[in-house]
Amino acid sequence: MKLVVGLGNPGKQYETTKHNIGFMVIDAIADSVPHTPWKEEQRAEVCSITVDGEKVLLVKPQTFMNASGESVGPLMRYYKIDPSDVYCIYDDMDLPVGKLRIRPNGSSGGHNGIKSLISHIGTENFPRFRVGIGRPLPQWTVIDHVLAPFSEESQEKVQKGIKDTVKAVLGTLEVGIDKGMNQFNPKRRPQR
């Protein structure tokens, strides 16, 4: 069994914010494959899908971003899921809007939702699907940026990023994180 966790904030007022790209991807995965009804469990919205014969829980913590681990840690322990089987999808300001980067582990990179997961899971060794939201405008704070909706002109890139991430998550669930990174991470151009 695996957990696929999308990070975000609960509530209508946050639905379309950049910080909620993880929730958007989870919803898009659920829209693309058959799933069980959503239910409330361990302070999260949870449903399950089957990928390649394996049960996969789709998870949207309802604890607010900075406390996401308070939901994910207990779910992981209840279902006896190894950290390497907890796939986390979240926003990344260091990537251009809609771009995807998959990593097998790593530090929080200053992301408070990931800090919370690391704290409650007890390790940095869980796969990440980082979805780009771009950098804030010069006059904006980081908080203003992540809690604002995507601009109208970036919607095409956002939708492509969500679609690409859905494909990458489902594909990686089938082939594993190493092959998934090779298959779905952007290819590096050769140095000249």
Model-derived features: positions:
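Nucleotide and nucleotide-moiety/phosphate-recognizing core
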Residues: 2-105, 115-129, 136-141, 156-192
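Conserved TIR/SEFIR loop-to-helix hotspot centered on a Trp-containing motif
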Residues: 108
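Active-site proximal helix-loop segment of RNase H-like, two-metal nucleases, encompassing DDE(D)
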Residues: 144
